[in-house]
Amino acid sequence: MVKLPPLSLYIHIPWCVQKCPYCDFNSHALKGEVPHDDYVQHLLNDLDNDVAYAQGREVKTIFIGGGTPSLLSGPAMQTLLDGVRARLPLAADAEITMEANPGTVEADRFVDYQRAGVNRISIGVQSFSEEKLKRLGRIHGPQEAKRAAKLASGLGLRSFNLDLMHGLPDQSLEEALGDLRQAIELNPPHLSWYQLTIEPNTLFGSRPPVLPDDDALWDIFEQGHQLLTAAGYQQYETSAYAKPGYQCQHNLNYWRFGDYIGIGCGAHGKVTFPDGRILRTTKTRHPRGFMQGRYLESQRDVEATDKPFEFFMNRFRLLEAAPRVEFIAYTGLCEDVIRPQLDEAIAQGYLTECADYWQITEHGKLFLNSLLELFLAE
């Protein structure tokens, strides 16, 4: 018998006003109106099929991602979250996050979302530079980003996050730090600060822009990290910074190899069973197929040989120590199966080990891919 990990719920809203050239998420440019009521009903039907996966557990966190969830109307959000509460037991202090694009933010709608149960908003700012926002294909300007942050702050939500990117096309060190300073000035409890990466199957993938070189990227990261630390933010994951007590609980559950039910277009799920079986689910990507009632695209059991890599893949993105008991409890494997890999990781200086946990080192963070490759199945 394995210990069932904490459970989260991910809900995907697939539409955007327009597709950004760097984005490889499952998002679809909107043609006409959002089918609010129909899509919400399909989401709840999809959840009905998966509700047994909860296995009596409370849902600790909900994350509504996209696409652009802030295109959903207030009443539709109310129906959606009421429907979730009717089907699943929510923890009394459940964190309920939704993503918002500053270009789609309306004060009344934010209030409606809060009334529906949303207590944390993640705002996709990306940059405060008009020129950089245009290059990124964003539909908002710097002032709209600041207005959205101030609106979120004024609602008295449990928390809000600003998403910010660095390493943008032709971005100088001073421009990157300028973005960070403006974000810090808005005093978000949480900041996600991540490097732009060029993904295949995107506009940038087919026509790559000129990005800062590795030396410039390192300077941006190093000085940006110092700026955030001085402002009271603690880094707890590769790209995540928070004031004390404001870490994103939903993402922490992903990174700690927790379980999550995924509903909506292209949503992924991971479910553990008492016998140690781990099931991964993927939902139909395209809204057309999904809204014809074809919700499940595929599902597969995680092979025992793949479990160590899957456990460590996200665990080692976190700066906190990884408890050794969790590896055994959440994978159903004993440590003996990875002892040679652990010894190699320790010998390479990637990890330290004590009686209770493994801790990734500074060297391990720099060579994270090399560390993870040790745990890949032969």
Swiss-Prot record:
Matches recorded under CDD domains: Radical_SAM
Binding-site residues for [4Fe-4S] cluster, renumbered to this chain: 16, 20, 23
Keyword Glycosyltransferase set for record: no
GO BP terms: porphyrin-containing compound biosynthetic process
SMART domains the record matches: Elp3
Phenotypic consequence of gene deletion: Very slightly decreased anaerobic growth in minimal medium with KNO(3) and glycerol.
Cofactor section: [4Fe-4S] cluster
Chain positions recorded as S-adenosyl-L-methionine 2 binding sites: 67-68, 126, 138, 163
Location within or outside the cell: Cytoplasm
Keywords of this entry: 4Fe-4S, Chaperone, Cytoplasm, Heme, Iron, Iron-sulfur, Metal-binding, S-adenosyl-L-methionine
GO cellular component: cytoplasm
One Pfam family named in its UniProt record: Radical_SAM
SUPFAM superfamilies named in the record: Radical SAM enzymes (SSF102114)
Domain Radical SAM core: 1-237
MF-aspect GO terms: 4 iron, 4 sulfur cluster binding; coproporphyrinogen oxidase activity; heme binding; metal ion binding; protein homodimerization activity
Positions of S-adenosyl-L-methionine 1 binding: 10, 66, 99
Family (UniProt): Belongs to the anaerobic coproporphyrinogen-III oxidase family. HemW subfamily.
Subunit structure: Binding of the [4Fe-4S] cofactor promotes dimerization.
Purpose: Probably acts as a heme chaperone, transferring heme to the NarI subunit of the respiratory enzyme nitrate reductase; transfer may be stimulated by NADH. Binds one molecule of heme per monomer, possibly covalently. Heme binding is not affected by either [4Fe-4S] or S-adenosyl-L-methionine (SAM)-binding. Does not have coproporphyrinogen III dehydrogenase activity in vitro. Binds 1 [4Fe-4S] cluster. The cluster is coordinated with 3 cysteines and an exchangeable S-adenosyl-L-methionine.
NCBIfam families: hemN_rel
Further comment: Might carry two S-adenosyl-L-methionine binding sites with only one binding to the iron-sulfur cluster.
The protein's name in its UniProt record: Heme chaperone HemW
Organism: Escherichia coli (strain K12)
Higher taxonomy: Bacteria, Pseudomonadati, Pseudomonadota, Gammaproteobacteria, Enterobacterales
Gene name of the record: hemW
